[in-house]
């Protein structure tokens, strides 16, 4: 668990909604964690630090989901899917030219197709924006490595190029933010219109009844299929968000293990993690517990953390409520190996090492362990 706590949080993107056509931004995972925290506050089912860790995990899943949702295969699939809706709608409109429904179903189908095309435009804009940002993030690294290899560059010239590069990236960033804001507003408006359009379509289809089914079967059943797809995908997305939210709250180590297995290494390297202090936990007997409580000035000692791999080990006495890992919610057992981060928070080695491989920040307070290691290396130099 920990000796100090701070927190921060952000959003979840669910890339579905309405027939797989529209991206819907939700905060399902984090809201599920907060709901569980409020529900359990009176019964103390799960303590505050454990809930903060789960909110951080939900945020990490949101970022991963956002990246996966705008990966090339998913974007291509989304584009083909929506294009198929447009093609089918166009074909049915042509084939049903002799049908005269008593409700304006053709208008509804045309509006549905336009929303599909609008969604495709928004997805393409967002995909291009993310690709350009990724290339821009990689270019400073390549330029810095090339500049370090070319020793002939003058210092003033290097500073001038760096300044010009910073200005150029600032202008590109501002332009990207404007485009991103426009695309977000456009997608939000499209989502809102889609919901209203779905209600209108449902009203027209249900009002027409059997007369529509018999007199204009092609238009009628196409509307039924489109409405059904929308309902299916909305229910699927809500159910998926609930399942993942419950999994984050109740089975966080499993989620971390899955991310560790499938995700690329974007956090700390094995060398960075091995540099962090490792401790062994030791439970204390009643007599020793009384002595430790008096020495440390703590009400109820849960055990002692002893530093590993050093001739003069440091020891920390842990209060009873801190003698558990707030990732897996398991109490520390005798001879359990713990990892203490530079911020002072500690967890099971097996739990936190996988987390740091994915994200180099403390799961509780979001302190970046790489900043700490870089600072220490700078001092040694």
From Swiss-Prot:
Concerning Pfam families, the annotation shows:
zf-RING_2 (PF13639)
Q: Which UniProt keywords apply?
A: Coiled coil, Membrane, Metal-binding, Transferase, Transmembrane, Transmembrane helix, Ubl conjugation pathway, Zinc, Zinc-finger
Q: Which reaction does it catalyse?
A: S-ubiquitinyl-[E2 ubiquitin-conjugating enzyme]-L-cysteine + [acceptor protein]-L-lysine = [E2 ubiquitin-conjugating enzyme]-L-cysteine + N(6)-ubiquitinyl-[acceptor protein]-L-lysine
Intracellular or extracellular location(s): Membrane
Q: What residue ranges carry the coiled-coil annotation?
A: 170-194
ZnF RING-type residues are 325-366
Region annotation (Disordered) maps to 1-23, 135-161
| Membrane topology field | Multi-pass membrane protein
Q: Which GO terms describe its cellular component?
A: membrane
Pathway(s): Protein modification; protein ubiquitination
GO biological process entries? protein ubiquitination
EC number(s) recorded for this UniProt protein: 2.3.2.27
Main localization (coarse): membrane
Domain comment quoted from the record: The RING-type zinc finger domain mediates binding to an E2 ubiquitin-conjugating enzyme.
Entry protein name: E3 ubiquitin-protein ligase At1g63170
Species annotation: Arabidopsis thaliana (Mouse-ear cress)
């Amino acid at each position: 668990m920990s000796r100090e706590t701070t927190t921060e949080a952000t959003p979840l993107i669910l890339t579905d909604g309405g027939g797989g056509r529209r991206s819907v931004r939700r905060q399902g995972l984090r809201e599920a964690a907060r709901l569980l925290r409020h529900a359990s506050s009176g019964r103390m089912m799960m303590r505050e630090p454990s809930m903060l860790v789960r909110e951080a995990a939900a945020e990490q899943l949101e970022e991963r989901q956002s990246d996966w949702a705008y990966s090339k295969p998913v974007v291509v699939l989304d584009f083909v899917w929506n294009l198929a809706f447009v093609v089918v709608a166009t074909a049915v409109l042509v084939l049903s030219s002799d049908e005269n429904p008593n409700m304006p179903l053709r208008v509804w189908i045309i509006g549905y197709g336009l929303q599909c095309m609008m969604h495709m435009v928004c997805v393409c804009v967002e995909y291009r924006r993310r690709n350009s940002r990724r290339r821009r993030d990689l270019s400073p690294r390549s330029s810095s490595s090339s500049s370090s290899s070319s020793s002939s560059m003058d210092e003033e010239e290097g500073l001038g190029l760096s300044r010009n590069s910073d200005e150029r990236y600032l202008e590109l960033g501002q332009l990207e933010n404007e485009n991103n804001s426009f695309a977000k507003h456009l997608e939000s408006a499209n989502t809102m219109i889609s919901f209203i359009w779905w209600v209108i379509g449902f009203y027209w289809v249900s009002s027409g009844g059997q007369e529509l089914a018999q007199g204009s079967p092609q238009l009628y059943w196409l509307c039924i299929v489109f409405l059904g797809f929308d309902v299916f995908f909305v229910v699927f997305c809500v159910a998926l968000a609930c399942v993942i939210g419950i999994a984050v709250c109740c089975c966080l180590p499993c989620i971390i293990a899955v991310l560790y297995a499938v995700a690329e290494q974007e956090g700390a390297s094995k060398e960075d993690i091995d540099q962090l202090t490792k401790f062994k936990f030791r439970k204390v007997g009643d007599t020793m517990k009384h002595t430790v409580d008096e020495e440390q000035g703590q009400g109820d000692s849960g055990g002692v953390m002893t530093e590993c791999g050093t001739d003069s080990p440091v020891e920390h006495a842990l209060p009873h409520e801190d003698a558990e890992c707030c990732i897996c919610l398991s109490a520390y057992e005798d001879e359990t190996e713990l990892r203490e981060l530079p911020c002072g928070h500690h967890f099971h080695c097996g739990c936190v090492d996988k987390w740091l491989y994915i994200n180099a920040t403390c799961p509780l307070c979001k302190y970046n362990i790489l900043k700490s290691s870089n600072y220490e290396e700078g001092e040694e130099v």
